[in-house]
Amino acid sequence: MKKPFYITTPIYYPSGKLHIGSAYTTIACDVLARYKRLMGHEVFYLTGLDEHGQKIQTKAKEAGISPQTYVDNMAKDVKALWQLLDISYDTFIRTTDDYHEEVVAAVFEKLLAQDDIYLGEYSGWYSVSDEEFFTESQLKEVFRDEDGQVIGGIAPSGHEVEWVSEESYFLRLSKYADRLVAFFKERPDFIQPDGRMNEMVKNFIEPGLEDLAVSRTTFTWGVPVPSDPKHVVYVWIDALLNYATALGYGQANHANFDKFWNGTVFHMVGKDILRFHSIYWPILLMMLDLPMPDRLIAHGWFVMKDGKMSKSKGNVVYPEMLVERFGLDPLRYYLMRSLPVGSDGTFTPEDYVGRINYELANDLGNLLNRTVAMINKYFDGTVPAYVDNGTAFDADLSQLIDAQLADYHKHMEAVDYPRALEAVWTIIARTNKYIDETAPWVLAKEDGDKAQLASVMAHLAASLRVVAHVIQPFMMETSAAIMAQLGLAPVSDLSTLALADFPANTKVVAKGTPIFPRLDMEAEIDYIKAQMGDSSAISQEKEWVPEEVALKSEKDVITFETFDAVEIRVAEVKEVSKVEGSEKLLRFRVDAGDGQDRQILSGIAKFYPNEQELVGKKLQIVANLKPRKMVKKYISQGMILSAEHGDQLTVLTVDSSVPNGSIIG
C-alpha cells in the first residue's frame, strides 16, 4: 500500500487581491495533489490564510471595520478564486479558527514550561509589512538625521521599518542550531532546488543563529499568551503550526495527523519565506519532538519584463481575467510550463497567447481534430484494434512514448513541471510526425494497405489517450474533453498506463469540437495589455506623432531613470497643526499606507489659514525623500506635492476612494 501524501501551500496573508504570482503556488500544489491521487496515494491537500498580525489590525482600522470582518471578507474572496481555479484542497485553514488558536496557545505554554521560550526585551528595527525584526546591518537602506543618528530605514523587502523596544518572549533557536545543521547534513535533499539549503546555512546559521522574538505587546489582533495575556503570539509560531493543527495535532480527533504526518510530508513555499520554513519550522518541530517533513520546495517568482508586478507600471495580471477570456486550462498550463525550477519566470502577453495558439491549438488541438476526423472517415467512427508493428513507424512511436512516460514520472516526482510537460509535448510532436510518416490518406486509397491504415488509426487514438492521462493533473477539462471525443470515460488512474491498453470496440464522437480555437494574436495581446492597464502598448489604427520641438521647462531636463527613483504615494491627513515659532510651516501627521503614521512639515501655512480643512484629505506625497530636521525637534519624513498658480498654491489631492499608500506613477 502506498504511503499517504500530505501537501501544503503556505498560508497566504490576506492583504490584497491575489495576482497570477500569488496563484502559482496553489496551482502547483494542486497539480501534485492530483498526480499523487492518480498514482494511488491517499492525499491531504492543505491551503489557507494567515489572519493575525499588526498589518491586518491596521488595514481593518483604515477600512473602518473589525479585524475579524476584514479577514472574513478576504477569506471569501480567496476561496472564490480557488474555486475558479478548480483547486482540489481538502481543508482551508484560517489561523482565526478556534481549534487552531487553542493549540497555538497550548504549544506556547508547553514551550515556555520546558524553557524553549523565555521572557526578555527586544529592541530593533521592525517592519510591519514583513512582520519581522531586522538589525541595522540587515537594512537595505538607512535614514539618518543631521547628527548622523539612524532614524529609520528600509527592510530588504523594500518596506519601511520603525524602531521598536518592548518586552517579548523569545524562542531559543540558538539552542538547536547544531542539531539543525546535523539534520541538513543527514537530509541534503530536504530543501529543493539544490543550493537553497547552502544559502540558509551561510546567511543565517553560520553567522550565529539568534533567538527569535515570538510575542508582541503593541497590538492585540492575535492569540493571547494564556499566562501573560498582554502578549499576543507572534506570527511565525502561530502561522507555522497550521501545518500540524489542520490535521488534528493537539486535538481530540488526531487521526489525520497520525496518518498523514507519518506519511510523506511535502511543503511548497515561495523563495521569500524559505528562511522561516527551513529554520524556524524544523526547530519548532524538534522542540515538540515531532518528525521532520520530507521535502521543502522554494520556487521562484513570476516577474514582468520591467520587473515586479506593479499597478503603477501597468503590468499586474489577475487570474480571473485570464480565465474569463481564455479558459482555466490555458492558465494552469502556462503557469506550470513557464516557471523553471529554481529560478524566476517572466510573464508576457505575447508568450501567453503564443503558447495557446502554437502548443495548445496547433500541436494538441489539431492532432485530436485530425485523428477523430480520420477515424470517422475511414472506419465509421470505430477505433480499430491495437496491434504492434502494423507499420514501419509503430515501434519507434511506441518506444518514444515509453521513454517519455518514464521521464514524465521522474520529473513529476521532482516537481519539475516544465520538463514533465516537455515530455508530454515530445509525445504530441512525435505523434504529429507519425501522421506525416504514415500518410493515412494514401493508405486509404483503393490500392492502399487497409491493415496499415487500421494500425495508424489505433496508434493515433492510443497516443492521444496517453496524452489525456498525463495532462490530467494540469488540465482537467482538456483531459476530459479528449477522452470524451475518443469515446472514453474520464481519467481515473495513472499508475498503469500503456500505449497498448486502448479499449476495444470504442467509437469516437461523430464530429469533434476544437478544444482550443486559434486566437487572433494581436487582438488578444492587446486585450491582456488593456486589462493590465498598459494602454500605451495597445495597437492603434492611427497614432499621433508630436512635432520635434524643444520642450519648455523651468528646470533642467532629467532622465526617466532619475524620475523613476521618486516614489509618490497617496497619504491621508490625520492631523495638522501650526508649528510654534514659524509662520510658514504646517506639521502634518499622515497615513501613507505603510503601517505607521509619518510626520511631514510643509511651508504652506499662509495658503491654508484654516489648516483643519486639510484633515481627511488624501494628498500626494514624495515618500522616499531622506528624512531631514527642519525646525527644533521636528523631522520631516517626506514632501507634500502642490501646484503653484500665480501667487496661489494648492495641494494636490486624489479621490477619497483611492487607498492610502497607493503608488502614483
Curated annotation (Swiss-Prot):
> Which CDD domains does the entry mention?
Anticodon_Ia_Met (cd07957), MetRS_core (cd00814), tRNA_bind_EcMetRS_like (cd02800)
Keywords tagged on the record: Aminoacyl-tRNA synthetase, ATP-binding, Cytoplasm, Ligase, Nucleotide-binding, Protein biosynthesis, RNA-binding, tRNA-binding
**Example GO biological process term?**
methionyl-tRNA aminoacylation
What is the gene called? Answer: metG
Top-level taxon of origin: Bacteria
Residues binding ATP, per UniProt: K311
Q: Which GO terms describe its cellular component?
A: cytoplasm
Name the enzyme group at the top EC level. ligase
Q: What is this protein called?
A: Methionine--tRNA ligase
Task: Specify the tRNA-binding domain's residue ranges.
Answer: 562-665
Its subcellular locations are: Cytoplasm
Q: What is its main location?
A: cytoplasm
